[in-house]
UniProtKB/Swiss-Prot annotation:
Residues 25-52 form a propeptide. It holds the Pfam family Toxin_12. The keyword Glycosyltransferase does not apply. This is U3-theraphotoxin-Hhn1a 8. Residues 1-24 form the signal peptide. The keyword Metal-binding does not apply. Ion channel inhibitor. It comes from the Eukaryota.
Length: 87
């Protein structure tokens, strides 16, 4: 099961890379592949830099309040889903 997931992920990543290379080779701009790859990897950095007023799932809640739908675990100080079996 794990091997199937890994092979599907690698196949998908290969197809995306093939698309980027083919699209870049058809483009007249020589800097396009670098710009395309940097914009793809910059999206991840944008999400990391985005600050929230509340802490999401499994985020530290010592200084911030948890977002709606989550509660601060008294034992671990992480935002978790509320459950009837938790104290």
């Amino acid at each position: 099961m794990v091997n199937m997931k890994a092979s599907m992920f690698l196949t998908f990543a290969g197809l995306v890379l093939l698309f980027v290379v083919c699209y870049a080779s058809g483009s007249e701009e020589k800097e396009f592949p670098k710009e395309m790859l940097s914009s793809i990897f910059a999206v991840d950095n944008d999400f990391k830099q985005e600050e929230r007023d509340c802490a999401g799932y499994m985020r530290e809640c010592k200084e911030k309040l948890c977002c709606s739908g989550y509660v601060c675990s008294s034992r671990w100080k992480w935002c978790v889903l509320p459950a009837p079996w938790r104290r």
